[in-house]
């Protein structure tokens, strides 16, 4: 579903969503999985609007997802082509206006970053590592729950947990770097 190249032989599936599959005319070949996931409901919304199910005033408001799309795009370290840059810019605009899920706001607080002046640095080096650390050292669903919860108290609790896991990851990483240096010096 993203910027990774599909295998030479594709699985037997009803639907394969990948901008890199043969015959796909997608202009943004480096779109992250979160961007593909965001584009799917956008396309469905457009089709339903065309069929008269709703109009522009009554259609689902998908822009509320842009802060998560921006975070995922930066944290996935994809090339910031025009499409990805636009998604990140729109997501950052909402974050700076404090129009974001409470879990994202809690992650800003737990990481000591300021949402009103958020940059891609915050996504790539403060929030993203906290979410990813849970998947490496604990349970990846902690990060997902933090981003998706509507309960501010639960979001705060999860963000603090994620921050603690990330601190543990940094200690482990530092120990590994120190061990590698000792091995390198002994050669």
Which positions does each model-derived feature cover?
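Amphipathic alpha-helical transducer elements in NTP-driven molecular machines
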Residues: 10, 31-34, 38, 85-89, ...
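Active-site flanking residues adjacent to catalytic metal/cofactor-binding acidic residues
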Residues: 1-3, 75
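Short alpha-helices
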Residues: 12-54, 62-74
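Hydrophobic helix-and-loop "lid/oligomerization" segment in the mid-to-C-terminal part
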Residues: 46-187
